[in-house]
């Protein structure tokens, strides 16, 4: 009965408060990135994020797949870079709060994540020597880099720094990289890591602001009936009640960003038979070997603060076929859904969770919900109340002028 749905119990009000954007703590420092909160670095990162020159064909920027007007995603089931990317591009909004990056958690910082696509043949298709040369050839970039990180090394000498070289699975790039002197490789990788650190300083500012849901929760916490009635209709109240109750959604989608930042197997059928389908089981192995991880030589962190990496679970059946829980904020802008964009609408998503099919890989953690059609509609209507503005500096939320 909708009229009674207005009276939330003390326990329910506690849950609502925990999901409210007002409960989002200030961002903690990223010890692995000493320029994470440097305004000059964020400004440089903003330019780099939208710059298409940092790609093999000069046509792909970070913003190609993370478009501000599409909730910093791309509206496609699978991302499209220089080739077809086997994953759905997730939003960047609020990811600064996450300890893991990519759907399989194969990176452990925002800055190391930013480096992955740049050298992926199907994404930016670049190489780190090429990127350092672009930086050096642009007086504005050279100057900004110098102010933030110290003088940008000159990498124009092709005998020392081949135009296309990187430690990646592309034979020519790999051979050119292997032929370089160790000291020169370190110079290039240091500049490359700093490119990532500047981009991360920018991405840290992309934080969600209050949605209609947050206004409703605030009204509930203040006991303001009139505002509650104005902001949420009976369907939305019913959907919220299901979300925190028998829908079981908050088991994974909890906290003010509506994600536990963990990895779960939900039994989605993969699009193709690919090794990446094992998800977190492969991601954790990757991140432990990554030269740009928290413990690596390019990280600014003391080893003692790299607890997430050191103590992460590395094996177990629950990692197989598990992918990262995404935030539910701004869902209205970020369709299609899931790690391979398998579900194109929110109604398809709630129906999928209602059915909870058996997993083809590993074991699904879901149990059928047995919600009625009306309940599913209500749940979907509630999920549409989670869109809100971004609270970062507005000039940085669109391409540089």
Model-derived features: positions:
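Periplasmic c-type cytochrome electron-transfer domains
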Residues: 1-401
């Amino acid at each position: 009965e909708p009229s009674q749905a207005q009276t939330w119990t003390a326990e329910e009000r506690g849950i609502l408060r925990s999901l409210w954007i007002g409960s989002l703590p200030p961002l903690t420092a990223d010890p692995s990135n000493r320029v994470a909160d440097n305004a000059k670095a964020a400004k440089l990162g903003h330019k780099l994020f939208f710059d298409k020159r940092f790609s093999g064909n000069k046509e792909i920027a970070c913003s190609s797949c993370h478009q501000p007007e599409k909730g910093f995603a791309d509206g496609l089931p699978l991302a499209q870079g220089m080739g077809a990317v086997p994953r759905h591009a997730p939003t960047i909004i609020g990811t600064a709060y996450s300890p893991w990056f990519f759907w399989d958690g194969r990176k452990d910082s925002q800055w190391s994540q930013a480096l992955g696509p740049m050298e992926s043949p199907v994404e930016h298709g670049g190489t780190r020597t090429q990127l350092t040369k672009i930086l050096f050839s642009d007086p504005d970039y050279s100057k900004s880099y110098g102010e933030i990180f110290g003088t940008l090394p000159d990498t124009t000498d092709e005998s020392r720094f081949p135009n296309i070289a990187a430690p990646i699975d592309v034979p020519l790039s790999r051979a050119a990289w292997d032929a370089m002197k160790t000291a020169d490789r370190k110079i290039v990788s240091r500049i490359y890591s700093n490119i990532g650190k500047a981009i991360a300083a920018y991405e840290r500012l992309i934080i969600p602001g209050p949605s209609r849901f947050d206004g409703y929760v605030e009204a509930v916490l203040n006991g303001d009936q009139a505002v509650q009635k104005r902001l949420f209709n009976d369907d939305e109240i019913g959907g919220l009640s299901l979300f925190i109750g028998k829908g079981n959604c908050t088991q994974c989608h909890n906290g003010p960003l509506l994600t536990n930042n963990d990895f779960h197997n939900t039994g989605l059928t993969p699009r193709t038979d690919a090794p990446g389908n094992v998800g977190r089981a492969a991601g954790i192995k990757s991140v432990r070997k990554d030269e740009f991880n928290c413990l690596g030589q390019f990280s600014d962190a003391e080893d003692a603060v790299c607890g997430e990496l050191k103590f992460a679970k590395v094996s177990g059946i629950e990692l197989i076929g598990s992918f990262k829980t995404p935030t539910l904020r701004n869902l209205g802008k970020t369709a299609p859904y899931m790690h391979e964009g398998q579900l194109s609408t929110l109604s398809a998503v709630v129906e999928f969770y209602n059915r909870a099919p058996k997993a083809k890989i590993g074991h699904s953690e879901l149990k059928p919900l047995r919600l009625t059609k009306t309940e599913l509609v209500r749940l979907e209507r509630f999920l549409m109340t989670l869109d809100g503005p971004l609270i970062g500096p507005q000039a940085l939320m669109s391409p540089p002028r």
